[in-house]
Amino acid sequence: MVTAIYPGTFDPLTRGHEDLVRRASGLFDKLIVGVADSRNKKPFFSLEERLTISNEVLGHYPNVHVESFSGLLKDFVRRHDARVIVRGLRAVSDFEYEFQMAGMNRYLLPDVETLFLTPSDQYQFISGTIVREIATLGGDVSKFVFPSVDKWLKEKIAAQG
């Protein structure tokens, strides 16, 4: 049984993230979506909210499990005896950072592979940062996120005044 981990902040989970989960879940026996605590990034949604949102969107995949983690990805990967780390590459600008991270992960976890997946064409330009910016400025992000995520965004923005 091969377990893979798809780590990220998922702030918020977008249609691009779900696209990668859908495709990666077909490649592995078990896919764990690791929602990173990422306090240093000062996320828009709390860790608990991001877990709830991720479970709402991804809960119908039978071999996908959503779980939070903090600290080193290496420790999370070891705890789950995962063999693969899944990462998304939207553009060349993502590649340099992801290449460095893959190299460090290979050093720390020599028996674990990093698999890069590119999003489907319609999702190549979507990022959580862009979605948050559009939403907080009053724009429509419904084409980039699932209805439940759109609702979460609108409620959070309204609560912040």
From Swiss-Prot:
Record: residues binding substrate: T9, K41, L73, R87
Assembly with partners or alone: Homohexamer.
Record has Cytoplasm as a keyword: yes
Keywords: ATP-binding, Coenzyme A biosynthesis, Cytoplasm, Magnesium, Nucleotide-binding, Nucleotidyltransferase, Transferase
Residues involved in ATP binding: T9, F10, H17, G88, L89, R90, E98, Y123, Q124, F125, I126, S127, G128, T129
Gene3D superfamilies noted in UniProt: HUPs
Localization per Swiss-Prot or TrEMBL: Cytoplasm
Main location: cytoplasm
Pathway assigned to this chain's UniProt record: Cofactor biosynthesis; coenzyme A biosynthesis; CoA from (R)-pantothenate: step 4/5
The protein, known as: Phosphopantetheine adenylyltransferase
